[in-house]
Amino acid sequence: MDEELPDADRAIIQAILDQDQDVRGYHALRTRRAGGSRFIQVDIQINPDLSFREAHDISDRIELAIEEAFPDADVIVHPAPAGEARIERRVLSEE
């Protein structure tokens, strides 16, 4: 039976996102467990002036960090320009 990941697992994912300085915010964090597999998907908000390559590299970096925390997970990170979508949780910077 499919179920949402526990709050503790979601907190780990949120901490990974919060710690990445290139992530300005994120939304649509969706998690699922089916049998022994985990599925994690999130939309991140990044600097709209970055190149496609830079955006891809950021997404890859975050996917790898989440996969290190959850080795059995299928992870999808979708980058979007900051300010163009609803943000459920904003990452604050020290600027």
Predicted segments with their positions:
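Alpha-helical transmembrane segments and adjacent TM-loop junctions that form the membrane-embedded core
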Residues: M1-E95
